[in-house]
A protein has these predicted regions:
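Transmembrane alpha-helices and adjacent helix-loop boundaries
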Residues: 2-227
Length: 227
């Protein structure tokens, strides 16, 4: 009986720390969303550079994609947070998380958008150019809307992947969900309760994203994209 009592979940404790986890959840969401938005913008610009076939930009973009996708986020965060201050560049934990996630995610978003852009028939681009549109106008108004629709499933998969990667932010002292759970375990030995709250918080973030991605993909299939 004593063993059962010791292993029982303390719901009163869970209720008492909900505000603490609420703050950590908001910080994780805020940092993750900012990083993902920057990653999407980076990926879009890189995909455009590849599409326009500018040799220098293509080489720089290719090198960036290889580095960002083939180095762990944790290593990137350590370089930003601990390495850059050695050359006089100091970055706070939240900014470090955003920059690191954007750097990692930009490589994945580049590939997602690039595949979408390449799936658009080149004849459409040639037709738009023959009508007097500039290359930028053609990309913005003709290619990008179709490429975005085609890339949507890969984009949402990347969003979910990157949001899960926020779990390593605690390594640079960002007081996110993982940091809070580890802190509570270390201070009060509330392992079961802390992990329960951690898992619940990430499910609260990721399940809606997963459902949105599935819904979006089905809508696009019905519309005739990505088939």
């Amino acid at each position: 009986m004593e063993g059962k009592e010791e292993s029982a979940v303390d719901w009163a404790y869970i209720e008492s720390v909900l505000p603490l986890y609420g703050k950590a959840l908001w910080l994780t969401l805020r940092t993750g969303t900012a990083g993902i938005l920057l990653a999407a913008l980076t990926g879009l610009l890189c995909a455009a550079a590849i599409h326009w076939r500018i040799p220098v930009l293509r080489r720089i973009t290719a090198a960036y994609v290889e580095v960002s996708r083939n180095t762990p986020l944790l290593v990137q965060l350590f370089f930003i947070y601990y390495g850059l201050p050695k050359v006089g560049i100091k970055i706070n934990p939240e900014a470090c998380g955003i920059i690191g996630l954007a750097f990692l995610g930009g490589g994945y978003m580049t590939e997602a958008f690039r595949s979408g852009v390449e799936a658009v028939d080149r004849i459409q681009e040639e037709s738009a150019l023959s009508l007097g549109l500039t290359r930028f106008q053609t990309f913005l108004h003709v290619i990008l809307p179709q490429a975005a629709a085609i890339s949507a499933p890969a984009f949402m998969a990347n969003v979910i992947f990157l949001m899960k990667e926020t779990s390593v932010f605690s390594a640079v002292s960002l007081m996110d969900l993982m940091f809070t759970a580890k802190d509570q375990i270390g201070l009060y030995y509330r392992t079961t309760e802390s992990l329960f709250l951690l898992v619940s918080a990430y499910l609260l973030i990721l399940l809606p994203l997963s459902l949105l991605g599935t819904f979006w993909e089905r809508r696009l299939r019905h519309a005739g994209f990505g088939t």
